[in-house]
Structures are given as C-alpha cells and as structure tokens.
Amino acid sequence: MTAANVPGSSIGVDALPIRENLRGKSAYGAPQLTVPVQLNTNENPHPPTKALVDDVAESVREAARELHRYPDRDAVALRTDLAAYLVRQTGVPVTVDNVWAANGSNEILQQLLQAFGGPGRSAMGFVPSYSMHPIIADGTETEWLPIFRRADFALDVDAATAAITERRPDVVFVTSPNNPTGHSVGIAELRRVLDAAPGIVIVDEAYAEFSDAPSALTLIDEYPSKLVVSRTMSKAFAFAGGRLGYLAAAPAFIEALLLVRLPYHLSVVTQAAARAALRHANETLASVHALATERVRVSKALDDTGFRVIPSDANFILFGEFTDSAHAWRAYLDRGVLIRDVGIPGYLRATVGLASENDAFIVASDEIAATELTSSGDRG
C-alpha cells in the first residue's frame, strides 16, 4: 500500500498539536538492517543456551494458564530473584524491598523522571553519554542540562561538581560504564557527585557486568535519600528481547515509583521469562569473560592499525579519528558490517561480537583506515 492510500497520511507530525518541547525532535533508534555482521546495539552476541530456552518456554507455558488474570502488579517473586542476583554479583545485602523492575531500564528511568523530574525541574548529564537520558527528560518536561566531559571522554569530577553546585539539578545522571565511551566511574568520584547533588543521583549501570569497577550499590546505605542504581538484563544477560530493567535503592524510592507506575505494567509472560533467565545467570554470564577478552583483542588490532581507541570497560569500543564519521559508517556498511554512529564527530562505536564477527570488523577497519582516518588519527 502506498502512502497515498494510508488513511490520514496527508498530514505530518508538525500538523498535530504536539507539545512545543517535542516539536522538531528526533525519535531514538539504531538502524535495524539485515547485514552479515551486526555490531551496533551492544547486545550479547551469544544466543541463549538450550537449557535456558527450554526453561523460558516451560515457564511461559505455565504462566499462560493464568493469562485471564492480571499479573502480580508488584512483581514480588521477580524482584526477590533480582535482589538475590545483586547480592551474589555485588556482595551488597539488598532485599526485595530495595528492588524495582520494569519493561527495560528506559522505563525505569522514565518512571524516575516522572517522580523526581517534570515541569520546573531539571536533570543533568555528562555528555557524550546515553542518548535516551535527554529524550526521557524531554518526554517528562524535565529541563535537560548537558555538561561536557574531558577531551578524552572521561568524567571531569571537578567540573561536574562545580556544575552541580551552580545549576542545582533535581536529578543527576552518571553512567558507569559510560555509553558510548566505555569509562567507569570510581566510588570516590561518585561520592563527590553525591555530596554535591541537592537532589537524586541515578547511576546507570547497564553495562556493569562487563566492568571490574565496584558497583555504586555499595553506597546505597550511605546515601539513602539520593542514590538510585539502574540496571538491565538486555546486555550481559543476553535478554534484550525480554525487555527487563530494574533498579536498586532505598525502599522509599520504590514507594515513590508506585505513585507513577502504570498498573500491572509487567506481564505474567515477562515476569516468568525473566525469572527463568535469572535461574541461568551463571551460564549466561560466562560469556562476559569471553567478550572482555575479545574487547582487548579488537582494541589492540584497532590501535595497531592507527585508530585512536578509547579505553572501555563495557562490551563496545569507541574509536576514531575519522575525517567524516558518517562517510566511514557507510564504508563499514558497504563491507557488510553494521556499527553505530553515535553523533560524536570523528568517532564510531562498535559492539564486541563473536570472534568471527570481530574478525570481519577488523578486516573492514584495516581497509577503511587507509582512506578515512585524519592525519592525527593515522599513527601507522
């Protein structure tokens, strides 16, 4: 069916009475293309094991018997399992009362800004960072205050605390490891941010399992009225299709989110599948070590070729410096390799994939380096 045959297609978004702060904005979205090598969305490339697939299938089958009933609106069993996982992974003795879950960490962040942001309030982030933070701020009518990182993309804590003191944001985002640069933020640095912040600090730990840095969870009892740690099962857990995000914080934060969450927001199917995935955490997370090893190998190969490689604690690598990053992105795509243009001039981001995928990426990079690097980036 052509556009002319689609009912209502004669108008565009600009013809709608949309909020002014959304007018002219672009929606979030990474290209979804069918190519031989997909390294653009930071998924775990290792598929679920047969045991996990079977467990999910059986768990969903059992849950389907109750599809005529609403799910547990507070997802108590799932939150209990998530708390147990966090205890094992971080050593911090959190309980079900410290944990909240939603449909991906983006919904977690949205609920937090619904409760603690909104009209007349502001949120600060240290850019470049996760591009959904300002989008969620716009969606909740929270003023977005971007503060730039250092030239090496690390967090400048002195500049961060000075900006917090000057602007006094209601919400501060700290992403560790940071997407798209890969840097982790140490506990001492987080303390300085928390001490300076007048409102809440959301530490986005979507890629925490890939990093050896201590989790911010260790600070919850020290900063109970300020600290929220958000996480996801989409990355290391290889559960991106399951859409499950969660947070850990003082119980009072969970009580606050109950005021803004939609009723029965997590389906019985999502809860059952996520609990099954958590039962297989050890086997799934075994791939993290392999991906970290591949990250080192790929980073060295890029460096040897002449790229500037930003050190990463995550499952992706930011690298450059390209004369034209958009043109370089297309050059990779022409070679069957899909990576991500994250909007940083001169740089692209590649997910660490399977060894064979990384080999194809390295071959493409060797070819592209000859024509796409700046003279400062080409050190070969």
Swiss-Prot record:
Signal peptide: none
Catalyzed reactions per annotation: L-histidinol phosphate + 2-oxoglutarate = 3-(imidazol-4-yl)-2-oxopropyl phosphate + L-glutamate
Assembly and binders: Homodimer.
Annotated protein name in UniProt: Histidinol-phosphate aminotransferase
Domain of life: Bacteria
Record's keyword terms, sorted: Amino-acid biosynthesis, Aminotransferase, Histidine biosynthesis, Pyridoxal phosphate, Transferase
One Pfam family cited in the UniProt record for this chain: Aminotran_1_2
Pathway(s) this gene product operates in, as recorded in its UniProt entry: Amino-acid biosynthesis; L-histidine biosynthesis; L-histidine from 5-phospho-alpha-D-ribose 1-diphosphate: step 7/9
Enzyme class, spelled out: transferase
Positions of transmembrane segments: none
Cofactors, names only: pyridoxal 5'-phosphate
InterPro entries: Aminotrans_II_pyridoxalP_BS, Aminotransferase_I/II_large, HisP_aminotrans, PyrdxlP-dep_Trfase, PyrdxlP-dep_Trfase_major, PyrdxlP-dep_Trfase_small
Family (UniProt): Belongs to the class-II pyridoxal-phosphate-dependent aminotransferase family. Histidinol-phosphate aminotransferase subfamily.
GO term, biological process aspect, one: L-histidine biosynthetic process
UniProt-recorded Gene Ontology molecular function terms: histidinol-phosphate transaminase activity; pyridoxal phosphate binding
Organism lineage: Bacteria, Bacillati, Actinomycetota, Actinomycetes, Mycobacteriales
Modified residues (N6-(pyridoxal phosphate)lysine): K235
EC number: 2.6.1.9
